Amino acid sequence: MEIFGKTFREGRFVLKEKNFTVEFAVEKIHLGWKISGRVKGSPGRLEVLRTKAPEKVLVNNWQSWGPCRVVDAFSFKPPEIDPNWRYTASVVPDVLERNLQSDYFVAEEGKVYGFLSSKIAHPFFAVEDGELVAYLEYFDVEFDDFVPLEPLVVLEDPNTPLLLEKYAELVGMENNARVPKHTPTGWCSWYHYFLDLTWEETLKNLKLAKNFPFEVFQIDDAYEKDIGDWLVTRGDFPSVEEMAKVIAENGFIPGIWTAPFSVSETSDVFNEHPDWVVKENGEPKMAYRNWNKKIYALDLSKDEVLNWLFDLFSSLRKMGYRYFKIDFLFAGAVPGERKKNITPIQAFRKGIETIRKAVGEDSFILGCGSPLLPAVGCVDGMRIGPDTAPFWGEHIEDNGAPAARWALRNAITRYFMHDRFWLNDPDCLILREEKTDLTQKEKELYSYTCGVLDNMIIESDDLSLVRDHGKKVLKETLELLGGRPRVQNIMSEDLRYEIVSSGTLSGNVKIVVDLNSREYHLEKEGKSSLKKRVVKREDGRNFYFYEEGERE
């Protein structure tokens, strides 16, 4: 194994090249090694580590929707990248077009390689001619002074799930992760109504929601005039402020969806400020195409854009919103021309830090379609898979497209991020009896697995279509929360997983799920008398203690 082209060994080193200088240290830590340091100059795409590639690897996509899966490193074929969604596939798509790529970390049986942060550079791994190579992508930005390297750890132990959990703990410590003690439950409009939501249907569900164990009532995409024009409503919707008022009057925490780093070509904000977006050759650069429109990315290096973002979210907070689902966040990190000479990752972090400052420490931010590592420490919850859907999706390609099957798979393979990076959002439960192709068993499989994983539980249905079976599944899912989950065979290639969780509201539980046959087997050991206590340490980590006494 080589580090910055040198034989791997403990110590402090200096690498001086024509365009850049790296000062780095290799130190022994629990279960492995840590490489840290600093760089100045023009490092470009900086090679950090090189070693022999394993055959079977767990690879990870850089953002919420992308797959996290086990693949054969030597039989991998690069995917066809949809030009409309180029940057959801990779922020360095030229790599993915040629090689197997994994962002932030990569795992094999008994070993995990993982970067602990993404504050300036984009960290990724590529398999090149039988070798696993770790890179830091600096996007051709020049640094006059030294800036910190994103630290890299190499962890080894026969227990691979333990290594992934340890890696996630180190990431949480490095980034002062936000891990709320309380996990909100709620309702979301999207997976029943999509863009056809009306205020009349919203009010109907608001009344029905009082019969469900929900705290948050979140309005998703459909209310806004256009992408970017978030404070102007359409159709029969009242003002954004009135929506929050009515939700709060009915006893719920008001929640709202935005895609804050995106503006459509038809939006007022773009037409009034065409210079606010990331450019290519001096012209607005399409970040992606959706809603039958070109979508541009806000230039988050511009002070006036950050001021606009702050005003937007501080206004939403003043209106009463306390739950913010912020979506399509990858747009903030697309490569391109920005006003300031900073990396796309630095720009993204400026944007998300501005939103956090605007909504306050007591608001809940749910990230979605987001770069993962750069968001740690800013969001409270994070979507960690593609959109679910009212169908299983056995014929849907595993490329981030909506499907219940792949959404649940990612909740399983990214399980270790939960309670360490943030709260994992596996996407919404769909429990209605009509207007869905999901079978009763598929609904149970999805819901119970999310419960055993201790994930966020948000339901998305026309609540008038949820009958006794759906209510029973929701109740039983909530009773599976509160534990410490572990996917024991995380390196499974056949989509069959064994998940255990200790200390849940139902005691110690185990669920064996098969995402191909859609079968599951749930075992409960019975309730324990142990009470779970959460203590937040000074370094930001949550520690979990189980004490004798009545359960909470």
Curated annotation (Swiss-Prot):
SUPFAM superfamilies: (Trans)glycosidases, Galactose mutarotase-like
Enzyme Commission no: 3.2.1.22
Residues binding substrate, per UniProt: 65, 191, 220-221, 325-327, 368, 383
Activity regulation summary: Inhibited by hydrolysis product alpha-galactopyranose and to a lesser extent by beta-galactopyranose, its mutarotational product. Inhibited by synthetic cyclopropyl carbasugars.
Gene Ontology molecular function, alphabetical: alpha-galactosidase activity; carbohydrate binding; protein homodimerization activity
Temperature notes for this entry: Optimum temperature is 90-95 degrees Celsius when using synthetic substrate p-nitrophenyl-alpha-D-galactopyranoside. The half-life of thermoinactivation is 6.5 h at 85 degrees Celsius.
Gene3D superfamilies hit by this protein: 2.60.40.2760, Aldolase class I
Reactions this protein catalyses: Hydrolysis of terminal, non-reducing alpha-D-galactose residues in alpha-D-galactosides, including galactose oligosaccharides, galactomannans and galactolipids
Summary of pH dependence: Optimum pH is 5.0-5.5 when using synthetic substrate p-nitrophenyl-alpha-D-galactopyranoside.
UniProt-reported outcome of changing residue 385 to L: Increased transglycosylating activity at high concentrations of p-nitrophenyl-alpha-D-galactopyranoside substrate, which could be useful in industry and medicine for the synthesis of different p-nitrophenyl-digalactosides
Family from the record: Belongs to the glycosyl hydrolase 36 family.
PANTHER family tied to this protein: ALPHA-GALACTOSIDASE C-RELATED, GLYCOSIDASE FAMILY 31
Subunit annotation: Homodimer.
Protein name (database record): Alpha-galactosidase
Species in which this protein is naturally found: Thermotoga maritima (strain ATCC 43589 / DSM 3109 / JCM 10099 / NBRC 100826 / MSB8)
Name of encoding gene: galA
